[in-house]
């Protein structure tokens, strides 16, 4: 790891100003992705701007039809928050199965979304729930936020402040995970709204994506049988040491069916 400077920001404007003044600086939240990259000398930021003590980034609010989570809230706090568990249990359940205890105690929702790892869990929730990512300067719909592998719509000096999740009628998340890392080989988040069903998949491609065929089938008939009857193409899916594209394509309707069963209680 190369040497770097560290400073703790006290508000979003100060954090953004520090990054704007140094193009080689990086925001630091839980550090669960950034610090390992730095240890391998794959990243060499000149400064780390710690945003974990900014009060505006640490709050959780549950209002009528919406759950708002500050960007610096760790996974464990999302999982354990009583109001989140009541209003949006699928999100709490997702957070409670990210990584191990250390990762859940340090990793943050904002850091996960900004990093946009292809196998991360939170992007599937953001996409399926039609979340809005609130930054220090604008509001970004989830459909516009995730651009590609480790890429988002964020500007280099733009800071996520909070994430707003609409509350669906029913929802569930199911993943087939790597037993060592707990990353998803395939993860499926299903959300049923009055307007229809949204299905988002992580771990299977270069970035999170929705599956229109499953959404149409489940909007017409919200049953596991309807999900299992859908065939998903493997043409744009990943093949790696963990699973082939064909196997991932097979898993998507299987896990979707399990998520529907889970959502139906």
Regions of interest found by a model, annotated:
Residues 1-265:
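C-terminal structural segment of proteins
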């Amino acid at each position: 790891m190369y040497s770097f400077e560290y400073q703790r920001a006290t508000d979003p404007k100060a954090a953004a100003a520090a990054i704007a003044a140094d193009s080689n600086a990086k925001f630091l939240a839980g550090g669960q992705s950034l610090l390992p990259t730095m240890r391998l000398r794959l990243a060499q930021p000149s400064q780390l701007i710690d945003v974990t003590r900014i009060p505006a980034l640490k709050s959780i609010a549950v209002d009528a039809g919406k759950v708002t989570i500050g960007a610096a809230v760790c996974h464990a706090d999302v999982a354990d928050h009583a109001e989140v568990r009541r209003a949006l249990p699928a999100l709490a359940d997702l957070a409670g199965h990210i990584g191990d205890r250390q990762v859940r105690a340090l990793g943050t929702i904002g850091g996960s979304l900004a990093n946009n790892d292809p196998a991360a869990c939170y992007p599937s929730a953001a996409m399926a729930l039609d979340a809005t990512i609130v930054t220090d300067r604008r509001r970004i719909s989830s459909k516009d936020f995730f651009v590609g592998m480790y890429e988002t719509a964020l500007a280099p000096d733009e800071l996520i402040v909070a994430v707003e999740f609409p509350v669906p009628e029913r929802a569930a998340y199911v993943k087939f995970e790597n037993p060592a890392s707990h990353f998803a080989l395939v993860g499926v988040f299903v959300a049923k709204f009055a307007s229809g069903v949204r299905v988002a998949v992580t771990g299977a491609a270069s970035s999170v994506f929705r599956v229109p065929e499953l959404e149409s089938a489940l909007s017409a008939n919200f049953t596991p049988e309807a999900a299992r009857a859908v065939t998903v193409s493997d043409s744009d899916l990943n093949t790696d040491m963990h699973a082939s594209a064909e196997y991932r394509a097979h898993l998507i309707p299987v896990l979707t069916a399990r998520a529907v069963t889970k959502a139906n209680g």
